[in-house]
């Protein structure tokens, strides 16, 4: 049986999901497919999919790459992401 997540782990999971949603929304507004954005960022399309679905903990390096590639300023910690 899987252990219950602590409040902090739940919050991290929630932020990951919200940030992934925001990245997907911005990507779609900019007219990029996951494949096109992956090529622009020089990463795998599957990595973008995992990030957008909250399955991958994004690093600051990736956040900067998304920001530059999508011409969008992401807020690192914002409860209203």
Predicted segments, located by residue:
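Recognition helix of helix-turn-helix/homeodomain-like DNA-binding domains
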Residues: 42-56
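Short basic helix-loop element that most often maps to the first helix and adjoining turn
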Residues: 21-36, 40, 65
